[in-house]
């Protein structure tokens, strides 16, 4: 990111950088000895101590730039993975709307039992959103917001399955 920023800035293009997908800047939460956390419980405690609901504001009012003038249909794009890698592309439909639908479906139908079902491969007990998070299609910020809405805005109480899922998104 820094290399791209420097290149574009050198060409005289103004760039504004902001963290839209995370709650805290990397390295912000540190131990009392000013080290990165290596254990979840103290990390989560510090995370909650510093948390403010305003961190979850998702501003949808940014000006929309003119779209590029070409047709694109990613949904029908052949990545060539199915034949060579045996990947069922229907498992992860393309796009942010599909990712958000998956999060909401998980929270509505599976999250209550998540803490007991998440480690059993025989059960379909997980959210299956890792690819969406890894690719930046949906943010951990958005997932936490949706989880909190479903859990009456409770981080540490409420439905144990939802709090466990939020814990794992926080640690991610």
Q: Which sequence ranges carry the predicted segments?
A:
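Trp/Phe/Arg-rich N-terminal binding region typifying the photolyase-homology
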Residues: 1-55
